[in-house]
Each structure stands twice: as C-alpha cells, then as structure tokens.
Amino acid sequence: AVAAALLLSGCRKGNSDSGSMSSSNAMSGSSGSASTTQTGGWKTGLGILTEASDEARTGTIHTIAAAVLLDGDGKLADVMLDELEVEVTADGKGVVTMPTDYRTKRQKGDDYPLAAASSLKKGWAEQADDFADYLTGMTPEQASMLETDKDGKAVDADLLSGCTIRVDQYRDAVAKACTNASALGAAKGDRVSLGVEAENASSDITATDDKDVNAEVDLTVVAL
C-alpha cells in the first residue's frame, strides 16, 4: 500500500496575524491541512490535489499544488503551480525501494526533460507559468470553467501557443486554492510563492508473510 502524509502550511513575513484553512482528500491514505498568513482585503489561497495508487509492484503518489493571490475585486492577481510524482517499487521478496529524488517538476528544472519533447521547446515551469499568467485577471469562477479536451489540455489557441501540457488538474487545484483563500493581509504589489518539500517517512519497508508494508512520504507545502 502507498500512503501520503501531508503537512501543508503557509506564512507571510512581516505580519503577526495568522489564519488557517484545511482540506481533505478522498483517496485512501492521503489528507491535508493548510494555513496562511496575510493582511487586508486581498486573499491568499493554497490548493492541494493528492492521490495515491498502486498497481502490481509499483505505487505512485501524485501531488499538484497551487498558490493563488486574489485582489480586492476577487480576481486572480497571481498564481504559482508545482507538481510532484513519487514512484515506489517492490521486488518479489517483499523489499520496497523508495526513490532517492524527491524534487518537484519545478525544482528539477532542466533535469525534467520536457523541453526536448515539447513542440514549443519549453520546459515544465515555463509552460506552467504561462498557464498561470493566462489565468491572471480572471475570477475564480472563470478560471474553474476553463475548457479542456479529452486529454486535459487547453482548447484555447492563445493558451496553447504557450502551454501544451495537460492543465485540467492545475485548473482544479487553482479552483480549490480560491475556495480556501482568506483575507489575512496581502496587498497590491505582492506576489505569491509556493514551496514543496517531500521526504521518505517509511520506517520499515520490508514485507513478510505476516506483515504488509506502508510506503509513506511526508509532504510539506508552503504558500508565501
């Protein structure tokens, strides 16, 4: 079995006020909570989509995170996205192998070889940022209604000119972040930042006839 244990938090420097928001995931073995800190009528939100799945001897933990900043009119002023895929494998003797690289797609940069395969010759972060820029100025409702095709890719020609990756889950994470957003102190001119950190949280990864193994990864997600 594969489990994802989430610790989601956020803060903004220079402000002693604080607020909190929480979310849960229906996928077995995954849950989340989040908190942010801000000021004033602008709002900051953190949205997390996490699923854990296993098939045969391979398990996958997939997390998409979105941080948003809503202006005084309730429109998206800034968006930042990131994505993490963790794959766990097991052999026929019950020994589970955890990954050694827990970097997100944004953190991997050129080590995530999307640019070479992309018709746009653009990496993941560049395309994700183009998608984020496209959403800027929209209301949360408009962003949540972004149309995609059967493969989850955008259908709008302007968006496709800068972003050809699947965006339906990014759209949904942004919508969740908007729902979670709280007016805790952001102001005009602020930008939102997103940090994701993952680490192996499995204590015993060898299965026996009498004992199954839970491969667990701790995730910390921070919106600033």
Predicted regions and their residues:
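Sec-dependent N-terminal signal peptides
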Residues: 1-3
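Active-site- and interface-proximal helix/loop "cap" or "latch" segments in soluble metabolic
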Residues: 38-224
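Bacterial lipoprotein signal-peptidase II cleavage site
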Residues: 11-33
